[in-house]
Amino acid sequence: MGQELSQHELYVEQLKKALKTRGVKVKGNDLLKFFDFVKDTCPWFPQEGTIDIKRWRRVGDCFQDYYNTFGPEKIPVTAFSYWNLIKDLIDKKEADPQVMAAVTQTEKILKVSSQTDLRDNSHNKDMDLISLESDDEEAKAPSEKMTMSNKSPKKYPAMLASQNNNTDKDPDLSEVDWDGLEDEAAKYHNPDWPPFLSRPPPYNRTAATAPAVMAVVNPKEELKEKISQLEEQIKLEELHQSLIIRLQKLKTGNERVTSSGNIESHSRTPKWPGQCLPKGKYLINKNTEEYPPKDIFPVTETMDGQGQAWRHHNGFDFTVIKELKTAVSQYGATAPYTLAIVESIADNWLTPTDWNTLVRAVLSGGDHLIWKSEFFENCRDTAKRNQQAGNGWDFDMLTGSGNYANTDAQMQYDPGLFAQIQAAATNAWRKLPVKGDPGASLTGVKQGPDEPFADFVHRLITTAGRIFGNAEAGVDYVKQLAYENANPACQAAIRPYRKKTDLTGYIRLCSDIGPSYQQGLAMAAAFSGQTVKDLLNNKNKDRGGCFKCGKKGHFAKDCRDHSNKNPESKVPGLCPRCKRGKHWANECKSKTDSQGNPLPPHQGNGMRGQPQAPKQAYGAVSFVPANSNNPFQNLIEPPQEVQDWTSVPPPTQY
């Protein structure tokens, strides 16, 4: 015991030093208690004698199970902390020489102690594993313990003594006086006696025995035994599944009986160069395969680790079927985009049942019947060529009818037969009639009110490519639709340059038109009481032409277009000036009215300016005598006198 304690103290000191190098200080007593707890919860740990990260994680799992079972009261507080610290040391033992030395020393001590425990267990197989002695008795000398072991046990001494005595004093049953015993027993059944207040406890003469000693089992040996059993079970299951697959192939006639007895080495290989097999999404576990598979899935073939080929069904991707259905509805069954999806699906191994199910799901009833008739016709032509070639692939195999109506039989077809079915199905699809207007879906692509013009053009080009196969073929049509299906703001920006630039020019012109531009147009239209479209049309209207005819190059007074005269002009009535004749008053030239009275002359322009002040000369004025013979003198007023100089200032206002 002292040697074991010294060894424990030795590797505890090693661990303390290793933890100290990492800046962690721990107490030696706490580590000793921790390893005692490890030994109690994980008795296998000292026996294996190896410390690595895998075994140390097993110790952590044991701690967690112990915690879940007995609760936090039964586990030391520092148990998980020390476990994490030692885990970090084990993870980095390669980089630290001191930690490596501590782990190596601990493994040696564990191996020595485990060997000592095994030798002690082999010599003392009948030793009681549960000690009934107290902790104080364990501290006594070994001599005292030997003396105490020779004494009788302290617990239940009377029962054990009676048991030992009775084993020697049991009488022979043949010598018992049974009549006397019955008379004595009858005395204990007197009805006049009062009943017992309580039944006496049953007397158990068997002494409490210690639990049996369990033999120490090496966990490595037990694990190896379980692994060998599992490997044997896996081999038998693989053999069983391979026999089932081979039996199905023999029933369908796709496998020839060979003299080779190695069933696991059988695998299907390509029969001609360049032939490729469809790849499955993952390797299927043969233990979980379901037979028979569902009847609506394409066939895939995978290879396991031993080279064995396994065929199974994987489900159609729902997004692919949805995309094909959408393409058929929007662009038509024979559009290039739709045919591209069909060809991508046909790259897999599809049985005739798979093709029939797929076509029925995405095409209308009439188109499905047309496809089926074309498919059968193609299969008849292919079957005739196969008959001439002598490969045995007849009409029933190509169409999945007759003896090959079951999907299990179709699943075992050769790759060449799958290729013939693919060609017949895709050729039948290409012969479907064109319905409706292919450009109807293209004209339905319109720009949203807040959608950028570049995104709208991209949608337009994508749709045109799916309909025409090549967007360059309908570039003029796309350019026209880019203007007609654009929103009013983009149309107003493109209109002046519509015939002067191409589609890229349209994109440049509308690159700045965004939500803020649309908001400004809406506000301007609201203030002007117009719609956005009317506002943009009036804004771009040219006002530089003739007001009379609207043409450029002349004014209204020079316009020679007499066809635009207003036919609804008023006819002048009776002249208000002369009261005779129908003409306008400003055009009246009469001197008298209808009564013969003279009419005043016209007053010129009819506009009179500001009256002027009388003109008067100040200062010396020369006098000209009046001459009656002057023809220009028509004044009657008397002649003015000669004015002298005056000091009167001129008038301030006229």
UniProtKB/Swiss-Prot annotation:
It comes from the Viruses. The record marks M100, A101, L160, A161, M214, A215, F297, P298, M523, A524, Y618, G619 as: Cleavage. GO terms for molecular function: nucleic acid binding; structural constituent of virion; zinc ion binding. It comes from Simian retrovirus SRV-2. One of its GO terms (cellular component) is viral nucleocapsid. The keyword Lipoprotein applies. A lipid is attached at G2 (N-myristoyl glycine). This is Gag polyprotein. Residues 132-152, 588-654 are annotated as: Disordered. GO terms for biological process: viral budding via host ESCRT complex; viral translational frameshifting. Residues 215-251 form a coiled coil. PANTHER family: ENDOGENOUS RETROVIRUS GROUP K MEMBER 24 GAG POLYPROTEIN-RELATED, IGE-BINDING PROTEIN. SMART domains: ZnF_C2HC. The keyword RNA-binding does not apply. Keywords: Capsid protein, Coiled coil, Host-virus interaction, Lipoprotein, Metal-binding, Myristate, Phosphoprotein, Repeat, Viral budding, Viral budding via the host ESCRT complexes, Viral matrix protein, Viral nucleoprotein, Viral release from host cell, Virion, Zinc, Zinc-finger. It holds the Pfam family Gag_p24_C. Residues 101-152 form a propeptide. A zinc finger (CCHC-type) spans 544-561, 573-590. A motif (PPXY motif) lies at residues 200-203.
